[in-house]
Structure formats: structure tokens, C-alpha cells
From Swiss-Prot:
Record protein name field: UBX domain-containing protein 1
Location, primary (coarse class): cytoplasm
Cross-referenced SMART domains: UBA (SM00165), UBX (SM00166)
Ranges annotated as biased composition (Pro residues): 186-199
Alphabetized Gene3D superfamilies for the sequence: DNA helicase RuvA subunit, C-terminal domain, Phosphatidylinositol 3-kinase Catalytic Subunit, Chain A, domain 1
GO molecular function, one term: K6-linked polyubiquitin modification-dependent protein binding
Superkingdom of origin: Eukaryota
The organism of origin for this protein: Homo sapiens
Amino acid sequence: MAELTALESLIEMGFPRGRAEKALALTGNQGIEAAMDWLMEHEDDPDVDEPLETPLGHILGREPTSSEQGGLEGSGSAAGEGKPALSEEERQEQTKRMLELVAQKQREREEREEREALERERQRRRQGQELSAARQRLQEDEMRRAAEERRREKAEELAARQRVREKIERDKAERAKKYGGSVGSQPPPVAPEPGPVPSSPSQEPPTKREYDQCRIQVRLPDGTSLTQTFRAREQLAAVRLYVELHRGEELGGGQDPVQLLSGFPRRAFSEADMERPLQELGLVPSAVLIVAKKCPS
């Protein structure tokens, strides 16, 4: 049976004549499939229906084939013979094949668009994951910097406490030296005049014992206690510093000043008392002190 030309087939499938001619020309008359691909890809172009300026037969510098010449308007056959007409059944069969080809092309285009959409979605998710990872890295860097800052502040605080302890030790050494000088410069005690010989050794008055150390127990507000031995001539400030350095973090961790109290008799030690030796405050040889938070002045 006679075959429809590419142009006739496109027109039979419902494409406008001008658009079909343009598709064949721009694809170099490579056949109906190439023309249909072009038509489906450019169906939404605003200039798709604009006519070509050059003759259809000379597109891309190519001479049309004999079958294409038969489909060009105004061109006759080389021998001048007429083209046999298609029967209605042949025309319907060829139209059916063309429609199936169009449907196949449509399915291929939909599958391609679906693959492209899936690829765009994968790209979007990948970019989202990369952005989330970048944010997490930034957060980790900030947390690391904050931890380093806390460690630096802690080291500076410990260094400051060490300087305070060293100063207290120097002050204690100076006071010990001062005490030693003043005690040595005191005149020797006057010997009492001899009295009557006691009738029994048990009647002699007890000798007062001098203590060089004292044991201090400090009760904290949470019910726990600290126990430490100090020299009798150390200042009460040394006890307060020891408490501030060793009490738990939940009690302030050395951040707030503390008030020292004695239980029996009840007494609150003042700042002036902090400069006095433990033996002078009556805390030798042992004593129990109570810690309370110092009220702001």
C-alpha cells in the first residue's frame, strides 16, 4: 500500500501544517520521529507557529529526498506521475501507527520528566543533608569554643586562688617571724617567792599546756563536714579559705563568701577576727565551726 509522507502523517495526527513543516525543516527532514520529538519539546515555545524564512527544501543545506519531494507543497514527482491515493482503511491503519508512535513518545517524555524530578528531589535532599551537617559542625565548634572558654576561666580562677594561698602563706610566715621576735623579747617571768612546802604533791596546781596545733571541724549547710588541722598561730582567714576551696559546687563552689560561726558559745566571727590567730580566738586545741552564707553588706 502507498505510504503517507512525513508531512501528511503529521497533519493527519492533528498537527498544524505550518508547525509540521517547520518541525521537518528544523530536523533536516530526518523523518517523522525526529519531527515529533521536536514538536513535543517545543510545543510551549511562543514562536512555535512562526513560519520559516527559508524554503523548506533547502534547510541545513540538504537536498530533499524523492519521498520528501512528494510531500513538499508545490513540488511534483520527477516523472510527473501522480501519487496513488490511500484507501480509507490504509489511512486509518497508518494513522493508528502514528498515534501509537505519538503515545510512545509521550510516555518516554513522561518517564524522562519523572527521572529528572527524582534527580531534582535527590539533589534537594542531598543539599538539605549538607546544610544540616554544616549547621551541626558550626554548633559543635561553638560548643567546643565555649568549653575551652570555661576551661580557661577555671584555670584563671585556680591561678587566682593559688596566688591567694601563697599570699596567706607569706603573711603567716611574716606573722610567725613577728611573733617569734616579740615572744623572745618579753622579759622572763619573775620567779615566785618561796612559800611553805606543800604537804602533798597532789596539791600542786596543774601546769597549763601549750598547743602548737588545733583541729578544726567545719559543718557545712548541707550537713556534711570538713576536718583539718591548722597551726595554733594561723589566722582564722586560713580556715575560711580552706572552706571556700573545698566545699562542694552545689554550695557555691567558692563563688560566694562565707560566714564562720562558733556553736558554744554562740559567736559570729567578723572580718577583724579573720586576722587573729586561732589560739587567740580560743579555738585551740580543737573547735567546731559552722558555715553560713555571708549576707551582702
